[in-house]
A protein has these predicted regions:
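Function-determining sites in protein domains
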Residues: 3-167
Length: 167
């Protein structure tokens, strides 16, 4: 009986340790395996309720907002959600209220080397805010991860404010 308890506690300890390692804070570079500072442009769209139209944008490297976004995303730490292990990125719904917003950012790169020796270009990292839920897509593995950040609501609002500002 005592041996069974030790085995069960050991299994529980390993599971807790694995969860802590999986959800540890990471930079976007650690998640996407590419240095976001090498990004050449940022494109995407945004929308604020009650508007039904999306506003698209393209920010070149010369645009101050592009460098603001790159710096903001490079400095932020992200925690992968355990829900990623249970459910692939399935659809979700949300009934928007006045003032709710969503955005989608594509970080576009020129030819970029990955740690495994391969090279790629184009949209290598994509970040999406769906009414408060942050999703990060990485091209190197083709996965979309739900992530959280510290002070997430303020972070998501700041990104929206930058991309929705008039040039």
């Amino acid at each position: 009986m005592k041996r069974r308890h030790i085995v069960l506690l050991s299994i529980l300890a390993v599971l807790v340790l694995a969860a802590l390692i999986y959800t540890r804070p990471m930079t976007l570079q650690q998640i996407g395996k590419v240095d976001i500072a090498q990004c050449e442009s940022v494109s995407g769209y945004h929308r604020r309720a009650p508007d039904s139209e999306f506003t698209s944008f393209e920010l070149s490297a010369e645009d101050e907002r592009c460098s603001q976004l790159i710096d903001l995303f490079a400095q932020q730490k992200y925690r992968r959600s355990l829900i990623n292990l249970l459910s692939p990125d399935g659809g979700s719904t949300h009934r928007p209220k006045d003032g709710d917003f969503i955005w989608d950012l594509s970080f576009n790169f020129g030819p970029t080397d990955f740690p495994d020796g391969s090279t790629d270009k184009g949209t290598l990292i994509q970040c999406r805010d769906f009414y408060g839920t942050l999703h990060v897509f990485t091209a190197i593995d083709g996965k979309t991860l739900r992530c959280t950040t510290s002070e997430q609501e303020a972070f998501l609002r700041l990104v929206y404010d930058i991309i929705s500002a008039e040039p």
